[in-house]
């Protein structure tokens, strides 16, 4: 009878021992997704003078486990300034959206930069995690090209004899943030006025490629003056003389192709 009692106690004590199922063990994990709303899929930043210089990545971090996690957020962007939350605490099976803001400098050279967002579990229910759990997303930050130009006449005015050929020189500056091609010539009104008066006009180069912020390129307008007309006014020396305005124009081809308008500048001689 005593032996039976001992056996019963042993069997009973075995049945009440706690058994921890394998799937209840604490194994931290984190999921991270990021995207850009820009059409290219990259985080695009406009850097033309007056732009806000900001690009944004939209991210979602989630805790796939049945316990609370504290998650640190780290961001690198190839030297660009970023703003983002330092850490996020998520309850069981919870998720949270956040933004990563990237700021560029005005007039920065067109380029692509690497953006890396990393989410790392640093606490599990208030305690250090037993393993390293992190999720990382890599994206591209695209510093967008913008157009800019300046033109100037080398000679503000010229006095020419009749039936004389003259090179009229202008300087074209590329003030955009990448190499650009510029079409050069005379405005339509100026060309019509000069041709109607009998000028012959030729342009050796109608397109010029210039590196960003490089030395100015030289553009030439070759004029051959007409014969003197008896209809022209007579000056103080008793000679027929008439003043014409030559209106030079340069246009960024990148702007016409990509910016929705043609960025042009004019200069006069």
PLM-predicted stretches and their roles:
Residues 22-269:
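Long beta-sheet-rich domains in secretory-pathway and surface-associated proteins
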Residues 1-25, 59, 170:
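Secretory targeting signatures
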């Amino acid at each position: 009878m005593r032996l039976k009692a001992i056996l019963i106690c042993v069997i009973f004590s075995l049945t009440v021992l706690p058994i921890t199922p394998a799937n209840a063990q604490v194994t931290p994990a984190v999921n991270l997704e990021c995207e850009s709303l820009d059409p290219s899929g990259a985080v695009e930043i406009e850097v033309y003078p007056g732009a806000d210089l900001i690009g944004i990545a939209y991210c979602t971090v989630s805790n796939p486990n049945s316990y609370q996690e504290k998650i640190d957020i780290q961001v690198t962007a190839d030297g660009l300034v970023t703003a983002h939350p330092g850490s996020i605490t998520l309850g069981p099976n919870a998720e949270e959206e956040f933004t990563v803001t990237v700021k560029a400098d005005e007039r920065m050279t067109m380029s692509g930069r690497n953006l890396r967002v990393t989410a790392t579990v640093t606490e599990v229910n208030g305690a250090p995690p037993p393993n390293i759990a992190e999720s990382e997303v890599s994206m591209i930050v695209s510093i967008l090209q913008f157009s800019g130009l300046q033109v100037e006449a080398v000679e503000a005015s010229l006095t020419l004899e009749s039936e004389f050929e003259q090179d009229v020189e202008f300087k074209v500056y590329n003030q955009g943030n990448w190499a650009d091609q510029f079409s050069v010539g005379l405005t339509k009104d100026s060309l019509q006025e000069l041709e109607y008066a009998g000028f012959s006009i030729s342009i050796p180069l109608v397109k010029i490629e210039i590196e960003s912020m490089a030395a100015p390129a030289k553009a030439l307008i070759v004029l051959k003056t007409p014969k003197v007309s008896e209809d022209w006014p007579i000056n103080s020396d008793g000679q027929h003389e008439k003043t014409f305005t030559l209106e030079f124009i340069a246009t960024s081809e990148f702007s016409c192709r990509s910016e929705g308008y043609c960025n042009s500048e004019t200069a006069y001689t």
